Amino acid sequence: MKKIFLFLIAFVGIVACSKSDSGSSDNGGTGSVAGYNPPSWIIGTWINDLTKTTGYSFTKDDHCMIVHGSTCLLSGANAKIVSKVEQEVKGDVYTIKIIMNEGSSTYEKTFKKIADNKIAELNLAGEIESTFTKKK
C-alpha cells in the first residue's frame, strides 16, 4: 500500500511539473490556434515605412501579412495546415513561430517595439531589417 501511495505522489509531481510556463498560452488564450496570444502592444495594423503598401496585422485571433491584399496565417484554409504556434515575449521583443504541415515548413518573425506607434522587424542577428508604423 505504501508503494502505491508513493507512486501516486511521484506521478502527480511529474505531471504537475511538466506543464510549460513559457509565456505562451497552452490554450491560445482568446486566439484561434493554440499557442497564439500576442502581446497587447503589437495588436493592430503595421505598415512598412519604406514601401507604404506592405506590412503586418496582429489581432487577438490572427496574424496576417499585408502584401497585395492580406494573407492571414491562423484562420481560413491556412488554419488547417498550422501544426503549432510558438511565441516568446521578452520585454519589447516578440517572436512568433508558426509550424505548418507537421514541421515541413516554418514561418518565424521577430518584432521589437520602438515606440507606441512604431515597431521594427529584426533579422536573425537581432538587427533592424524594416520599420513599421501603426495604422490609425
List the model feature ranges, each with a label.
Residues 24, 31, 52-55, 66, ...:
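Beta-sheet ligand-binding and adhesion/scaffold domains
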